[in-house]
Amino acid sequence: MTEHEQEGGPPSLLLGALEPLRATAEFASLLPASPILATAPRGSGEHVLVLPGFMASDASTVPLRRFLDSRGYRTAGWGLGRNIGFAAIGPLLRDLLARANDRAGGPVSLVGWSLGGVMARRLARNHPRSVTRLVTLGSPIGGSPTRTSVWRVYDRVEPGRRAEVDARYREPGMLAPPTGVPSSAIYSRTDGVVPWQIAREQPGPLTENIEVRASHIGLGVNPGVFYAVADRLAQSPDPWRRFRAPVLLRGVIDHGRSADGGPTDPGR
């Protein structure tokens, strides 16, 4: 990812204003999309921990978790209430992952939405042996979150941290993907909260970017996202292959691409 991409500003005010309406339409599209979603790859009881976005709670991830449960996964919310940021939640994350590992009897997959994805990615990077797979949804993993449209709200919760956060994201290795953990970043160019340029994963042999047509709020109720998440959770880490969208969903979801923009793995 280039320095220019990291320095982009927040999405347009129009995209932000349309978020609720677009998310409602995405939720309404789940029913007509159900025949396609019924073909999504099934799990075999794998444990999946789902982390919500900023100021959201487990209630926001219920639709996605119910769908994944219906496809044979064993999902769990994080049980920490509202996600009010790293200052309050950060110290609790390691214990959260440890409890999930205890329930599963081994490593688990992580799915994180927005800020939850940043937290999940940090867990995967710090504790790679405890994480099987990582999927982020519209998460600012490729640049400073001060460039998102919700930073003003975040600044009220944790005031005066802009300079500190920007400096931290300029540190060498801060944006590096987890080592040895397959990582899929799902993003939308029409995200009204997080600039799409910083919602993409860094280049690596186990990283990919999957583009969907979605609002930020709608990422948790979008048929294309549901299918892609189920597919990525079903993909074996060895050998790991990048995502290919089913024909009937190619209007709302793109093929997975290597994080450096290269083509999808032709062997799949």
Regions found by a protein language model. Name each.
Residues 39-40, 89-90, 200-201:
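Short, flexible segments with low predicted structural confidence
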Residues 5, 9-12, 174, 217, ...:
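A general boundary/transition motif marking the beginning of the first structured unit of a protein
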Residues 179-268:
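C-terminal catalytic-base region of ester-bond hydrolases, centering on the histidine
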Residues 22-31, 51-60, 184-196:
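Phosphate-binding glycine-rich loops and adjacent basic patches that engage nucleotide phosphates
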Residues 46-59, 63, 69-180, 186, ...:
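Serine-dependent carboxylesterase/thioesterase catalytic core
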Residues 22-35, 97, 101, 154-161, ...:
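Generic secondary-structure transition motif, activating predominantly at the C-termini of alpha-helices
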Residues 1-48, 61, 66, 71, ...:
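Flexible, membrane-associating and regulatory peripheral segments of lipid-active enzymes
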